[in-house]
């Protein structure tokens, strides 16, 4: 009986020690960024599904819409976020980039490189552009009395959280002025176009964060 109590006591101590270690060991920056990007991927996919269901009369499917990339000629995510072995001339590409780069807490020291720093800076700019557009569209949607659809708050929060992790300069984001009396049909069609383009970009972002958090 005494031996059983002693073993139970040891097991309790071991469990308490394990829980204590779990509390004090911080989550690494790259792991947190991966978790945030996965959450963004999920909330974006959910928002795309919601838009397809609620805007089914607006041809809001990937097959029907006119695809438009608002980041085209503005950022270089697709070039800078290629695997390092595919970059033929890193220094040449870097000279064409702006000197202001953002990496925040997502880039681990062992994977630090000029291209990955530029990659994360470009991802940050992507998110900033989409966040600005989504805020303007959401304001326009909320101005419509029937409110057929509005953007999911979870997706907007997920964008903001990942941007905060990427933003080590503490940049204050400027919100785009709300759209005035915009045509409801045009606003909803633009929403469909943006959501599909954004969901594609989020897949790329999630892959980058997965690479950075891998051993």
From Swiss-Prot:
GO terms for biological process: cell population proliferation; cellular response to lipopolysaccharide; defense response to protozoan; immune response; positive regulation of T cell differentiation; positive regulation of T cell proliferation; positive regulation of type II interferon production; T cell proliferation. Gene3D superfamilies: 1.20.1250.10. Glycans are attached at residue 89. It is found in: Secreted. Belongs to the IL-6 superfamily. This is Interleukin-12 subunit alpha. Residues 1-22 form the signal peptide. It comes from the Eukaryota. Its main location: secreted. Keywords: Cytokine, Disulfide bond, Glycoprotein, Growth factor, Secreted, Signal. Heterodimer with IL12B; disulfide-linked. This heterodimer is known as interleukin IL-12. Heterodimer with EBI3/IL27B; not disulfide-linked. This heterodimer is known as interleukin IL-35. Interacts with NBR1; this interaction promotes IL-12 secretion. Heterodimerizes with IL12B to form the IL-12 cytokine or with EBI3/IL27B to form the IL-35 cytokine. IL-12 is primarily produced by professional antigen-presenting cells (APCs) such as B-cells and dendritic cells (DCs) as well as macrophages and granulocytes and regulates T-cell and natural killer-cell responses, induces the production of interferon-gamma (IFN-gamma), favors the differentiation of T-helper 1 (Th1) cells and is an important link between innate resistance and adaptive immunity. PANTHER family: INTERLEUKIN-12 SUBUNIT ALPHA, INTERLEUKIN-12 SUBUNIT BETA-RELATED. Disulfide bonds join 33-106, 60-192, 81-119. It comes from Mus musculus. Disruption phenotype: Deletion mutant mice display normal development. However, they are unable to restrict the progression of Leishmania major infection with strong parasite load in lymphoid tissues observed. In addition, regulatory T-cells are functionally defective and mice are unable to control colitis (resembling inflammatory bowel disease, IBD). GO terms for cellular component: cell surface; cytoplasm; endoplasmic reticulum lumen; endosome lumen; extracellular region; extracellular space; Golgi lumen; interleukin-12 complex. GO terms for molecular function: cytokine activity; growth factor activity; interleukin-12 beta subunit binding; interleukin-12 receptor binding.
